[in-house]
């Protein structure tokens, strides 16, 4: 499972410059990391900022394992089935996703890796928060006719509205390993150990992952799924990871049908790149 990691995603237009662009940006600390929102029109910033802050605040209250009154803490002593049955409607999909990924990965990803009496959803909480924020902004945007917006939480991104170009930073720190576009509703997440060694743990052993993987980047139709997949695919590595993705293809509980639209980029310590990218999303 995953601890807080350094940020590796930077919007490409912030690096390349924004000549003639009216992009507005706002950032603030939340959920143990940094959140930021970007809007292409100045007048849209209050709407995207309000929707995002409300969603992130809600998730912080619901899934804080250090808060004895949070839903996560209240449910942690129940069985996995009872957790799903008793979870609030707003977060049930969060638990279902965690337990499904745990089952398909053979326990490599496990929200109970700290012990049977502890639920830890840190590996997907950021993605869940991003999905809520994007849905909230899109709903408000329809009534207010608001424009394009991109939401970032700790380096995980979701296009709340419109299309955005971004890139995953090279481990050598000299530019981008790849660039790609995010279309409306799509998200990208990365799990990495570039600077401080691995802070991602294999729940099967309880040890930090040491499998030659430097980072995994996942583009998916949900930020929560991108978050979960980037973590489990880092743990599993390319060979086991591809086997996991084949299982996901056949899994009826996967909410988006076949997983053909999931794009994955592994960057290895050897310098090699391994991809699962049927639609050619990553550009090198």
Which stretches of residues belong to each language-model region?
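Mature catalytic core of soluble alpha/beta enzymes
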Residues: 2-284
């Amino acid at each position: 499972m995953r601890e807080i990691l350094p940020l590796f995603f930077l919007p490409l237009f912030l690096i390349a410059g924004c000549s003639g662009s009216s992009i507005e940006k706002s950032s603030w600390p939340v959920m143990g990391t940094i959140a930021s929102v970007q809007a292409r029109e100045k007048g849209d910033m209050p709407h995207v900022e309000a929707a995002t802050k409300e969603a992130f605040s809600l998730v912080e209250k619901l899934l804080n394992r250090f808060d004895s009154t949070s839903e996560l803490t209240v449910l942690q002593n129940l069985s996995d089935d009872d957790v799903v049955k008793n979870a609030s409607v707003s977060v049930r999909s969060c638990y279902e996703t965690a337990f499904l990924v745990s089952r398909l990965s053979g326990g490599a990803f496990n929200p109970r890796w700290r012990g049977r009496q502890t639920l830890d959803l840190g590996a997907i909480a950021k993605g869940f928060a991003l999905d809520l924020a994007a849905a909230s902004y899109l709903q408000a945007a329809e009534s207010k006719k608001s424009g394009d917006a991109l939401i970032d939480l700790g380096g995980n991104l979701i296009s709340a509205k419109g299309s955005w170009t971004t890139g995953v930073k090279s481990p050598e720190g000299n530019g981008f390993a790849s660039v790609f576009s995010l279309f409306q509703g799509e998200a990208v997440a990365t799990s990495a150990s570039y600077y401080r060694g691995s802070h991602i743990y294999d729940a099967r052993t309880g040890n930090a992952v040491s499998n030659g993987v430097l980072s995994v980047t996942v583009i998916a139709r949900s930020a929560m799924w991108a978050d979960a997949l980037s973590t489990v695919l880092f743990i599993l590595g390319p060979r086991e990871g591809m086997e996991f993705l084949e299982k996901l293809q056949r899994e009826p509980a996967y909410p988006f049908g076949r997983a053909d639209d999931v794009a994955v980029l592994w960057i290895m310590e050897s310098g090699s790149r391994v991809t699962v990218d049927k639609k050619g999303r990553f550009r090198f």
